[in-house]
Amino acid sequence: MDKKRNISMAVIKRLPKYHRYLEELLRNEVDRISSKELSKKIGFTASQIRQDFNCFGDFGQQGYGYNVKELHAQISNILGLTKEYRCIILGGGNIGQAIANYNKFEKLGFRLEAIFDINPKLVGLKIRDIEIKDIDTLEDYLKENNVDVGIICVPSRSAQKVCDILTRNNVKGIWNFAPVDLKVPEGVFTENVHLSENLLTLSYLMNEQEE
């Protein structure tokens, strides 16, 4: 665990995929796996897999491979999944409701505690027993409750304003679904999910193949 310093973002981005495949192996009651076997499943080279894991410690044994249960636990710990994160959703429309209804996040330790929206037709509705609150009450809520992650699902014109409210109230993680790049202070971490950009990438790949 001492090797977590100066890990490249490319390696960090691959960790969730390792975690997902290791969960699948656990469900299938696989006890151990070699880097070569994992390579066939995950699509990275065996050398890349070994290099990635070596960034964090010596997980495998030569001639044995990796103990799946132990490796899964190690990756979970590296990803911070042994902790619990308090989350709120900003925007109770289609995307916000879809995220709220996806219970996989809670299994990973991300607990949804509140949903906010500006639309009076949505305020008061319940999603999985969580009542949508008026977004005008957001700042007061943040002063009274510790929140780790803000999930932004509002239109682009409102996203930065909402983000500013979150960051000045000590929210350190922003998961942004609004189609805009947010400005955040140092020490705040953002992950953007720009759905249209992914679709345009897919469009390019299909168009390139046709040519």
Swiss-Prot record:
Residues reported to bind NAD(+): 91-96
Molecular function terms from GO: DNA binding; DNA-binding transcription factor activity
Residue range(s) of DNA binding per entry: 17-56
Transmembrane segments: none
GO-annotated cellular components: cytoplasm
Keywords: Cytoplasm, DNA-binding, NAD, Repressor, Transcription, Transcription regulation
Record-linked SMART domains: CoA_binding
Subcellular location per the Swiss-Prot or TrEMBL entry: Cytoplasm
Record-linked SUPFAM superfamilies: NAD(P)-binding Rossmann-fold domains, Winged helix' DNA-binding domain
Pfam families documented for this protein: CoA_binding, Put_DNA-bind_N
BP GO annotations: negative regulation of DNA-templated transcription; response to redox state
Superkingdom in the source lineage: Bacteria
Signal peptide: none
Gene3D superfamilies on file: NAD(P)-binding Rossmann-like Domain (3.40.50.720), Winged helix-like DNA-binding domain superfamily/Winged helix DNA-binding domain (1.10.10.10)
Function: Modulates transcription in response to changes in cellular NADH/NAD(+) redox state.
Annotated family: Belongs to the transcriptional regulatory Rex family.
Subunit structure of this chain's protein: Homodimer.
UniProt name for this protein: Redox-sensing transcriptional repressor Rex
Organism field: Clostridium tetani (strain Massachusetts / E88)
Species lineage: Bacteria, Bacillati, Bacillota, Clostridia, Eubacteriales
